[in-house]
Each structure stands twice: as C-alpha cells, then as structure tokens.
Swiss-Prot record:
Keyword set includes Ribosomal protein: no
Gene: pyrH
Keyword ATP-binding included in the entry's annotation: yes
Protein's organism: Thermoplasma acidophilum (strain ATCC 25905 / DSM 1728 / JCM 9062 / NBRC 15155 / AMRC-C165)
Name of the featured protein: Uridylate kinase
Lineage, uppermost ranks: Archaea, Methanobacteriati, Thermoplasmatota, Thermoplasmata, Thermoplasmatales
Family under the similarity heading: Belongs to the UMP kinase family.
InterPro entries registered for this protein in UniProt: AceGlu_kinase-like_sf, Asp/Glu/Uridylate_kinase, Uridylate_kinase, Uridylate_kinase_arch/spir
Amino acid sequence: MNESIVISLGGSVISGDPIDADYMKSFARILEASKYRRVGIVTGGGRTARSYISVLRKLNVNENVLDEIGIYATRMNALSMASLIPGSNPTIPFTVEDAVNLMNTYRFVVMGGTEPGHTTDTVAALLCERSATRTLINVTSVDGVYDMDPHRFANAKRFDRIGYREAIALSTKSSAGAGPNVFMDITALTIAMRSRIRVIVTSRDIDNLEKILKGDRAVSTFIDDDQRS
C-alpha cells in the first residue's frame, strides 16, 4: 500500500444544484478501494459558497467576511463527505496542522478551508507540504490544464504535462477575488513548485479518477518539473 496522497475536491464537483449524492458515494467507494495508506481530502465551497458570496458582494460586504462565509461552506461539504467515508475523521479540523495530526490516526482525513485569503487548493498544497505528501490530485470542473478556457473556446488545447512556471502563468490570466473559478490558484501552484509536489489536474469523472488512483493512464494534466506538453 502506497504512503499518502492529497485530493483537492472542488466544491462545484459535489455541491451543485442539487447536491450530487451519487457522486459523493462513488467518490467514497473508490477511496476505500485505493492503494493509499493515508488520504487527505480538502473540499471546496461550490455553489453554496458562490451563491452567498455573489449576493453579499452586491450588498458591499467586505472580502474578508466573504472569505469567512466561503470557509463555512467548505467545512459543511467536508463534514458531509467525511460522514460517507468509513475510517475518516469524525470532526473537521480547523488548521492544516490539526489535519496532519489526524492523519496519524485516521486513514482518511477530510477538511475544508482554514483562513481568509487561502483557497482550498492552497490548503491542499499546504497539507501536502506539511505532511510530506508528494502528489496532489486536483479534481475540478475541467479535465486538465488548457491554453484557453475550454468552456469558451472549442479549439482549446489540453496539456498532458506542463511545468510549474507555465501553469502559474496560465493561472495568472484568471480572475482574482473570493470564489474564483480556475484550474488552480497561483499560491497553491507556488507551494507545489517550492516543495516539488506533483499536481494532477483532472475532472469529476469518477471512472477517470479511479484510474488515476490506481496509477493507470487517464485524462488529466501533470504539473511538475518535466516541461513536456
């Protein structure tokens, strides 16, 4: 059994309208069957977070408060996910350090956001760094990293593998602010680069994700030091 892996589970993947209960159950199933001894899962806020943030921003609520609201949404998703995974933590940790300590007790540790200004992708990267985990799977709304937004441009090219700096450059083009919708934020990518954490960006497709967990070839983008594309 391999040592450990961290998964950043985008909130939009599980917290849509309605909440995708079947996906959550399937996700729990493939985790249980995986070869990893320790699995950290960081959940995003999804539609719940975006809905509140969108409305309250129009009412001129400041960005720090909007971030706090987003964090509560991520923690609700985390507790929901943890309740479906046997052998996971019964309470949701508030900090990365708390999550790392829980990884010494539980095979599966699920958490949400931690503090304003940090996306859950950043939290996942910090969890990798703090727990000496070498691979981060980012499950998001696209099946990899593209040179353009694949939802807007039919001719967008998906990279099989790119380097950290190229990924950071592509992420820089995306919008900032609470609740951004990008393949991975700059801070998370910078943490991955400094600690040489391999990032695998992929979609919510459960069969595809299962292949990745098994180490099989799957639709995704690897972000690491290898500059081949």
